[in-house]
Amino acid sequence: MVTGYRMTEDEFVLLACFYELAAIPAWIVREPEELDLERVLGKLERRGLVQKMDGQDVPHLVIDFLFSEMAHSPCTAGGTDRIFCWFGAHAALALERNVTALSLMPFQTPQELFAYLRETGYERENLAFAQLDPAQDDAAAQLKETWEAGFEQG
């Protein structure tokens, strides 16, 4: 069973801006300027995803880890209207779009993520592989091989 962190699109957009994510799903259409920051921060605080410390809003350690992984991820895979994946140095993450919310799911290895994608049928949607940083050619090539091998093992 995958443990996920449910959040609204507004909450995700606010955190994505804070962590300066280079890649987000195309189906996220909210612009940061459209957000009611006080309302969104209030919801994040009530849910324990952001905490007040010395008058500052500080993300929970788990949220900090997950969004830092996404921000420093050299490669992503995405391309459907329901799921988007990041492959970081210490975790693989999937953002799944549900009817009312987004679920951010961390996996310890890419293989665990591939298994989840197979179980839920996402691999049949032909997730497109995208390379963010051309300077990361070796890492991107290795990730693409791992990605393809992960689906072949199923």
Roles of regions detected by a PLM:
Residues 19, 69-70, 120:
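Alpha-helix boundary/capping residues
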Residues 39, 112-115:
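Long, highly charged amphipathic alpha-helices
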Residues 48:
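Glycine-centered, phosphate/nucleic-acid-interacting loop/turn motifs that mediate DNA/RNA or nucleotide
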Residues 1-45, 55:
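Short, amphipathic alpha-helical interface elements at domain boundaries
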Residues 115-154:
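Long, low-complexity, charge-rich intrinsically disordered regions
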Residues 29-30, 51-57, 79, 126-132:
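Short glycine-rich, low-complexity/disordered patches
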Residues 22-25, 51, 73, 123-124, ...:
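Short secondary-structure junctions and interdomain/linker hinges
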Residues 51-92, 97-112:
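Accessory beta->alpha helical hairpin/"wing" motif in late/C-terminal subdomains of nucleic-acid enzymes
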